[in-house]
Amino acid sequence: MNKIAIQKPNIPENLQTADFHDAVTQDDVISMHLFEDCTICGEDIERLCVEKTVFRNVVFIDVSFRHIELTDVIFEKCDLSNADFSGAVIHRTSVKQSKMVGMNVAEATLRNVSFEECHGHFSSFSYSNMKQVRFDHCALMQSECSDTVLQQTHFDGCELEGASFTGTSLQNMDISTCRFEQLHVSLDKLKGCKIAPEHAIAFARALGAVIV
């Protein structure tokens, strides 16, 4: 599999440790901050801007950041489960070893974004537009990627059981290293999609074939 070159977040060495609630109260743009070993709870902010910032060991509880703009941001060992990032614009951002169960990233724009060893069961990326995005060794069972634009987007070693790519073109994509027995796809958008031999049964089922 050819590796897609992803631009890494540009993070300064000296970040200011801060309380998230205080930071959003004082500034229109959160910039050059480190949020570590804390909980962000009950925040409902639309069109928040975050840049050159690291979230490490942060738990997000009942948060809504619709249309958030993230540029040069790292999430490391965070819990983003059920967070609402719908409509987000995300550039040069890395999400590492984080929980994203039920996270809503629908209708978002992602450019140069990497997800590494994340648990994203039931997450939604539907109606999003992705370019130069990587999912490496992520658990994405029952996730939603319907009607999504995937340009130079790779899934490497991911668990995709029950995931939905309905309405999404998988043309010339390589998902041969991923694991699934059932995948929801649009048959007219599969030309050139590279799969492993064991995936053929799943695609035969999608065609309506009965395996005996």
UniProtKB/Swiss-Prot annotation:
InterPro entries tied to this protein: 5peptide_repeat (IPR001646), PA_immunity-related (IPR052949)
Keyword Nucleus in annotation: no
A Pfam family per the record: Pentapeptide
Cystine crosslinks: none
Domain Pentapeptide repeat per the UniProt entry, residue ranges: 63-102, 103-142, 143-182
Keywords: Repeat
Domain of life (superkingdom): Bacteria
Gene: yisX
Name under which the protein is recorded: Uncharacterized protein YisX
